[in-house]
UniProtKB/Swiss-Prot annotation:
Protein family (similarity comment): Belongs to the KdpC family.
Transmembrane domains' residue ranges: 10-30
Entry protein name: Potassium-transporting ATPase KdpC subunit
Subcellular location: Cell inner membrane
Molecular-function GO terms, alphabetical: ATP binding; P-type potassium transmembrane transporter activity
InterPro entries in the cross-refs: KdpC (IPR003820)
Membrane topology of the entry: Single-pass membrane protein
Organism: Pseudomonas aeruginosa (strain UCBPP-PA14)
Keyword Chaperone annotated: no
Chief location of this protein within or outside the cell: membrane
Subunit and partners: The system is composed of three essential subunits: KdpA, KdpB and KdpC.
Keywords: ATP-binding, Cell inner membrane, Cell membrane, Ion transport, Membrane, Nucleotide-binding, Potassium, Potassium transport, Transmembrane, Transmembrane helix, Transport
Name of the gene encoding the protein in the UniProt record: kdpC
A GO-annotated cellular component: plasma membrane
One Pfam family recorded for the sequence: KdpC
Length: 183
């Protein structure tokens, strides 16, 4: 029996070392050399180097002076991130959307963009379409006492246009840039 067990244990040990130690160390080393920012979580830092968040995970911003992220079904908690799984016919979904739209509605701005009242699949999408960010510009400019044009220019300068897919604005990066604006 030991004759059969020995090769199995040796295989287990070798494969455990290769797949559990060598391969992860190799991939981590390559990632740190080739993509250090992404390998470390795409962290955003303030002027003093303090980590404020990740470009990859949405944060909740309350108050009129901030651009708001998409609603989150899991209250922006990474542990419980998920979609709401409410069917379009569910009255609870219609009530939540109506409530969120009423909170986001700005007079004379037209209908609230869909991205500001619907949750994403993960509940943690950090980006908004540029239209949703521009929709909030008047509220943010008024609350901060800034010229509307300055805030609109900030949205435009933070609009990312990937090679594939629609243009997006990272809400955390945009709000970080807002803190640097002077009245």
């Amino acid at each position: 029996m030991f004759k059969q067990l020995r090769p199995a244990l040796a295989s287990l040990l070798v494969l455990s070392l290769v797949t559990g130690v060598a391969y992860p160390l190799l991939v981590t080393g390559i990632a740190q050399l080739a993509f250090p920012e992404q390998a470390n979580g795409s962290l955003l830092r303030d002027a003093e180097g303090k980590v404020l968040g990740s470009r990859l995970i949405a944060q909740k911003f309350d108050g009129e002076e901030w651009f708001h992220s998409r609603p989150s079904a899991g209250d922006y908690a990474t542990v419980s991130s998920a979609a709401s799984n409410l069917a379009p016919s569910n009255p609870a979904l219609a009530e939540r959307i109506a409530r969120d739209a009423a909170q986001e509605r700005i007079a004379d701005q037209g209908p609230v963009p869909l991205a500001l009242v619907t949750t994403s699949g993960s509940g943690l999408d950090p980006q908004l379409p540029p239209q949703a960010a521009r929709y909030q510009a008047l509220r943010v400019a008024t609350a901060r006492g800034l010229p509307l044009r300055l805030v609109e220019d900030l949205v435009e300068s933070h609009t990312e246009r990937p090679l594939v897919g629609p243009a997006v604005v990272n809400v955390l990066a945009l709000n970080m840039a807002l803190t640097g604006l002077k009245r």
